[in-house]
Amino acid sequence: GVVCWAKAGIGAVATQAMALIEHGPLGIELLEDGAQPQEAMKRRLSLDKSPEIRQVAMIDYKSRISTHTGSDTIPESGHFVGDGFSCQANMMWKSTVWGCMADAFVGSEGDLSSRMLAALFAAEAEQGDIRGKQSARLLVVDSDIQQYPWEGTIVDIRVDDNREPLEELDRLLKMHNEYANINSLDEKSISQTKHTGNPEIAFWKSIGLVQSGQISEARELALIAFEENSGWEELLLRCAKNGLAGVTDDTIRALLHTKQDD
């Protein structure tokens, strides 16, 4: 990616508008070394031969922010800095875009990724980019430093080429959230899996439901997977044979009974 850079427990950088990619990773390095966003921004722009055409935003783990929109960025361009967030845009049809993004972010509910997506939809509703639509990304990391570099990424979803990138991003975020709650066996989660019909989630949930004694619900979800691809039935048998994922002979009897009844 070019625009989005983030590291758990450190902060995030967005570099765009004739983007100079190095502002992203090197900006993160400065934040990690202890520089506050304002100082990190100043140091990065001092090394940029054309800061007037760039747009860069930095935020650290304490929600301190610095945002720069160069004087020669392609209009309409600008930014809005709020309480713990920044919205920035360039090459927009309207100068109202970043304000609308901020309103949507503040006015929406849900987790951070959902609110960020709401801001993106608000930008598009305000006519968005003069070039049209193609790509989008959501990147969210933990505010706490993690032990290992591969930990701490909460959401990282990219749509590189799509006629409706925000709708696709929304679809993928919902799928991501469903996977994140794959072990949840409450009524709401089960109902959602029935609605979306994702065979993998249905398969693994069905195993958990058998283990919790919810056999009827387990069979209903298992059928979603079995009807999608016979390989899920084979996987169930192989898991039992190898003693994996808590699958036992009782699990097989409970779930394959679904097909025997048919």
What do the predicted segments below correspond to?
Residues 1-200:
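N-terminal nucleophile
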Residues 232-259:
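TPR/TPR-like alpha-solenoid helical repeat scaffolds
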